[in-house]
Regions:
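GST-like domain detector, emphasizing the conserved glutathione-binding G-site
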Residues: 1-106, 110
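Active-site-flanking alpha-helical
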Residues: 48, 144-145, 179
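Residue-level signal for nonpolar/aromatic packing positions in well-ordered secondary structure
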Residues: 29, 43, 68, 119, ...
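Phosphate-coordinating loops and pocket residues in cytosolic domains that bind phosphorylated ligands
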Residues: 19, 171, 180-181
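Terminal-tail/helix-coil boundary detector
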Residues: 178-187
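Positions that flank functional sites
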Residues: 13, 134, 184
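GST-like fold's C-terminal all-alpha helical module
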Residues: 75-171
Length: 187
């Protein structure tokens, strides 16, 4: 967005943080008006609309905004949760043996693949997820596609349009800065 910001690492169970976000989840944005904003989709939409010069809000028509909402919801409600069984298999079984946990991870990996299949079909022949310009949804996809690339044998080889999109986003200066701020890449 080109605006200064401060990224702060928090412990979601910290009582001080829970005053900001009682759900104890990240992210949260202090908008400066006394009402913190939570949920990634809401925060990204807010930032895109309050910083229009960044050009991340996409087509401002009702249908254009509906498409942004649809794809943002896809990542929030379909893609992100598909990783839960992979990263936290103990949440999905009462068994604690490695064989049972491996089966849960395998089921999660299958869900991730299905989500990538849907995204691949959508991105085939496109440069961006929504419309003809980069939007906040493109940036929002980066962490989840990065996870997929790291957990799947062969990375993103089976999803060439997803891989191309992800590589373009990794080269984006704003994405690069955010990843550097998160300690995911070196300065």
């Amino acid at each position: 967005m080109g605006e200064p910001y401060e990224a702060v690492r928090v412990n979601p169970s910290d009582p001080e943080y829970q005053k900001l976000n009682p759900a104890g989840q990240v992210p949260a944005l202090d908008t400066g008006d006394g009402a913190p904003l939570t949920q990634c989709s809401a925060i990204l939409g807010y930032l895109a609309h309050t910083h229009p010069d960044a050009g991340l809000a996409g087509d401002e028509t009702p249908l254009g905004q509906a498409y942004l909402g649809r794809w943002s919801a896809f990542f929030t409600g379909d893609v992100h949760p598909a990783f839960f069984p992979v990263f936290m298999p103990q949440r999905y079984t009462t068994a604690d043996d490695e064989a049972s946990l491996a089966k849960v991870r395998e089921a999660g990996t299958a869900l991730v693949r299905k989500r990538l299949d849907l995204l691949q079909a959508h991105l085939d022949g496109r440069t961006h997820i929504v419309g003809d310009t980069r939007t906040y949804v493109d940036a929002y996809s980066v962490p989840m596609i990065r996870w997929a690339s790291s957990i799947l044998p062969g990375g993103l080889a089976d999803w060439p349009a997803v891989k191309s999109h992800h590589e373009r986003m990794l080269a984006d200066p704003g994405v690069e800065r955010a990843m550097r701020d998160e300690g995911l890449i070196e300065s």
